[in-house]
Structures are given as C-alpha cells and as structure tokens.
C-alpha cells in the first residue's frame, strides 16, 4: 500500500501528512512527513516487530534516562533515537502500526559503498567505539540489539560525526529484575537477524545476550575494513546451518579468521574478537577494556 498523501493521527491527536517513500526494510517502510525533522515508519500491525520497537522506545529510550546515563558514564554521545509519537491506521482490510521518529541522514552502508567497500582502520575503530558505547547503554537497561550492521547505523543529518544505531525490531530483553534469562534454546528464534552477522547464540535459538552483540560488531568491523568473511558467500544462499557451522569453526581461531577475511590480522581486532570469544553467555563485558583495545587502533 502506498501511504503518500494520507493523514495519520497519532496517540496525542497530532496529525502527520505522509510524504514520499524513502526507505524499506524487513521491519517496515519509511516515509517523509510534513515536518522535515521526522519520518514515519509503517508496517501491518499483525507483523509485530514495530510493536517491539514501540515498546523499546517507550520503556527504555527516554531522553532523561539517556542524558543521565551519559553524565554518569562520562560519554558524550549515545547513538539511539527517540520516538516522537505512535499510532494505528486502519485501511479497508488491514490495520497498520506507525511510529514517528527522528529523521536522519545516509546510512553507513551507503558510505562504505561510496568508498570502494572499505574504510580506513582509524574510521572503523572510531565507529566501533561509538557502537560499543551505544550497546553498553542498551545492555545496562537489560536489552540487546540483535541486528547490528552498516545499514542499521545512520549518520546525523547535520553532524556527520554522530552515528545512530537504529531498527529495534529484534531487540531482546535478556535481563529482568536483575536476573539474566536462562540459557535455553527456542527453536522459533533460531537464526534471527541478518544471517552474515548473526551471533552463534542466535543461530542456536538462544536469546541474544551481551556477548552476541559484541560478536556481531566484530564481524561488522572486519567487513568495514574491506574484508570478506569466510561465510559471506554462503550467507547469500540462506544456508543457515552451514553459516553457523562455519562461524563455529573460527571461534578459537581468530587469527585465521582475520587472515582469511583480510589477508592480515589487525592487532586490535585480534584482541577484540579473542576477548569476545572468551565471554560466557551470562557475563557482563568489561566495556572499558574493549574501548581501550579499539582506541589503540585510532592512534596507531
């Protein structure tokens, strides 16, 4: 359905005139609105993923909570956007859910493609630190992102040095009332996420915990440096079992993974991925140590 020209009424009774379609993904279509600072994200209500996003926005992404966390952690920027409004729209046969969210700029995937599919190591390390800061905030609220990738990392419209991790349709609550979810497989959750970057736990049907997001970020940084992961081509065939088995093969062979992917083994990624692979499912990472490792790649 083309929503352009429709007037949507949100939960606060404000109206939004839907403009042209500017993006489409697995978790909804994105349209401009009559306010250039915002876009509207729409999908059928029955799909459920936009409800997951809405719940995450309303429960976790409160500006006051983010600001307080930044001050307490002495971190200048947390790359998470907030939700302006939400609502439902009913057509003749289908009911739709919509969110009104901040309008951002180009995504990192477009930037990488415009740079011959690779970025300088310094840039990759800086991006890695920004995403690490962002997922640390999420993790300390008890949530994992579950789908970190370049197309889900978006530049600010004005300040191109600010990045935002978007698309919260696969967020998982791994902590509740201070208790970690148990290490129990759910066959319905197997292989969630983007196959090339899906963490091994997710392949097996476990809820993505902190180590899963960090694992995915490691795969992403290899790709942003211009590497081709050993399972990149396999993932295009949608052979989930073979992708999972190939990832598992490299868990204790980080140097081989890097040499196979990049033809060299950056010290920072060797240390980062090795440390990720040493984490248990329940363990809280030492984010400062991970930041320190990546920061070395910024200056050396």
From Swiss-Prot:
Its EC number is 2.7.11.1. Its cofactor is Mg(2+). The lineage of its organism: Viruses, Varidnaviria, Bamfordvirae, Nucleocytoviricota, Pokkesviricetes. Its main location: virion. Pfam families: Pkinase (PF00069). Transmembrane segments: none annotated. Induction: Expressed in the early phase of the viral replicative cycle. It comes from the Viruses. ATP binds at residues 22-30, 45. This is B1 kinase.
